[in-house]
């Protein structure tokens, strides 16, 4: 089984995914980290040198390589579900979990976060607000195809993990060890 965590940048996919994997006794991977290790470049460097299209193609390669893995929690890049047929592929190959946050919380996290995110790097507060609201609106068409949606607003990592595990229990009413 594969669990794919999807959602906008800053939604907690990596943090929650790592915790969920530990709770399940599964492996955890972050697709951005895999790309960075494979290329020897940070995500901002990839965007600068190769552009977003190249990055999205690399994401798809990584996704395809992960489909053969089992008992794994996968934190995807925020845009991964929105390109090619990635979302459909993830839904066929496992359980997709959308970590939903309202734009204002995403904006706050991005403004005060310590991760260099190339799509928002040089935006002033107004530009950031506009970017998040417009991009989230476009991406939610894909995010809303997830099998499970968790409102992660005001949730600790532990409580968000518990919500996911509870939703998995409901999804697998035979209680398959979650």
Describe the residue ranges of each PLM region.
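NTP-dependent small-molecule kinase module
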Residues: 19, 23, 137-178
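Walker A/P-loop
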Residues: 14
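ATP-binding Walker
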Residues: 11
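Hydrophobic anchor at the beta1->P-loop junction of P-loop NTPases
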Residues: 5
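Post-Walker A helix-loop "phosphate-sensing" segment adjacent to the P-loop in P-loop NTPases
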Residues: 22-33
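P-loop (Walker A) phosphate-binding loop of NTP-binding proteins
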Residues: 8
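ATP-dependent small-molecule kinase phosphotransfer cores
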Residues: 31-91, 116-118
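A glycine- and Lys/Arg-enriched "phosphate-lid" helix/loop adjacent to the NTP-binding pocket
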Residues: 92-140
């Amino acid at each position: 089984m594969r669990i794919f965590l999807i959602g906008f940048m800053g939604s907690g996919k990596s943090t929650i995914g790592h915790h969920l994997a530990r709770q399940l006794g599964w492996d955890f991977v972050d697709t951005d980290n895999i790309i960075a290790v494979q290329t020897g470049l940070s995500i901002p460097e990839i965007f600068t040198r190769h552009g977003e299209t190249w990055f999205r193609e690399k994401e798809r390669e990584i996704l395809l390589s992960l489909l053969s893995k089992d008992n794994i929690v996968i934190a995807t890049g925020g845009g991964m579900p929105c390109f090619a047929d990635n979302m459909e592929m993830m839904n066929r190959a496992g359980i997709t979990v959308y970590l939903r946050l309202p734009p204002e919380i995403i904006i706050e996290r991005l403004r005060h976060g310590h991760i260099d995110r190339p799509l928002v790097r040089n935006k002033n507060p107004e530009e950031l607000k506009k970017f998040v609201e417009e991009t989230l609106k476009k991406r939610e068409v894909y995010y809303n195809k997830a099998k499970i949606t968790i409102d992660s607003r005001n949730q600790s990592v532990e409580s968000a993990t518990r919500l996911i595990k509870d939703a998995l229990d409901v999804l697998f009413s035979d209680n398959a060890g979650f």
